[in-house]
Amino acid sequence: MASWFASFGMQVILFPWLVAVVLRQPPGRVGLAQMSLMAPSIALMLLGGAVADRADCRKLLMRYHLLATLPPLALAVVIASHSLGYAVLIVYGLAMGTLSALVIPARDALLTRVISRGLGRAVAVTTATQLIAQMLGIVLAGSAGAVGAVSLLVAQAVTLALGALAVSRLSPAPSQTVHAPGESRLDAMRDGLREAAGSERIRPVIIAMFAVGVFFVGAFIVLLPVLVRDAYGGGSAELSLVNMCFWGGTIVATMTQVRLGAMRRAGRAMMLALAGGAEVQAAISEPGPLYGLTLLCFAWGVGAGVVMTQGRTIVQLAARDSHRARILALFQLGFMGGAPIGALVMGYLAGLVGPRPAAVYPAGAMILVLLFLLFRSGLWRQEAS
């Protein structure tokens, strides 16, 4: 798990740096490129969950990690031959996005198969480990301007290969449930959707996570690279600094939850953290120095740590064993499926009104979603038990 997120951390910096700084693409095309990384989730995340519910997740993760070494190596060859173009990055984004959509459900299902007690704490510890690994990748990618993209892409591939080696040392983790004979993967996907839609505990969490994808993730992956480039004249180092502050806040929040244990009012914690994130977004619309942006990103990251940990805990505890991988895939699909929509919209919105004014719109939209959840769902009263 750590290897995948270390690789992801490198990609978080390298990909937008190549699009926005190296190729100097306008905000709309930055948004479209970021969309290519997330769009496969819409089509494949639930399929990945259906596959993981029926298979040995250890074997799946080994295969996915090895396949994921190919796109960064191919991109390194293209850059080394001075053939980098916008279309190449779109193809890379689609390839890595496809593999991410398959890896995440298998990873989450594997956790529930190896942890028998204390799942809430295990989720927090796992999340913290992932975020620390991602932070290391972000720090390493901050040197892209100095050491070059080729070296970092090779390092990304090596990290993924080491992950496959680590997974190979785990015990087999076959499916623990019996599925209906003759049930196709499409039937399994539909069954997972019905299960989530019919659950009063799971449904509002997935709605909230979809809003996170559209209004928070989409804004984060498009507005920040454009702001760093246009407002501060920054490159990979400044983009890495901003991301480090965000993910640093997420790590602090997650480690605090590990220390404190399970939150009693998990749904309430989620909603308050999302409201705080909307306030941070609105504040980003105001001009200020780079250190001000980094502080805002740290605060935003603290809220993200609460939302990710408590949301995943609610879903993992509420989902039945027979449907858990598919339900967790829907949880991930919520924000990863919403992100391409948000990235595309925010890219063109930033091109129309500018990156700072554009930050106000998703903040206001998130407040409207929270009001809907407050009055039309039980999320505010929901407990992680």
Region locations from a protein language model:
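The feature captures the transmembrane alpha-helix scaffold of multi-pass secondary transporters
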Residues: 31, 86-94, 206-207, 290-298
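Transmembrane alpha-helix termini and helix-breaking/packing motifs in multi-pass membrane transporters
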Residues: 14-22, 75-81, 136-156, 230-231, ...
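C-terminal transmembrane bundle of multi-pass solute transporters/carriers
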Residues: 42-47, 54, 58-60, 64, ...
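Helix-loop boundary and gating motifs at the non-cytosolic
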Residues: 1-39, 198-246
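Juxtamembrane intracellular "pre-TM" segments in multi-pass secondary transporters
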Residues: 173-207
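Helix-loop junctions on the cytosolic side of multi-pass membrane transporters
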Residues: 109, 113-114, 153, 159-183, ...
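Helix-breaking motifs and short loop linkers at transmembrane-helix boundaries and internal kinks
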Residues: 24, 56, 78-83, 286-288
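Substrate-agnostic recognition of the 12-TM MFS/MFS-like secondary transporter fold
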Residues: 1-12, 37-50, 56-71, 88-145, ...
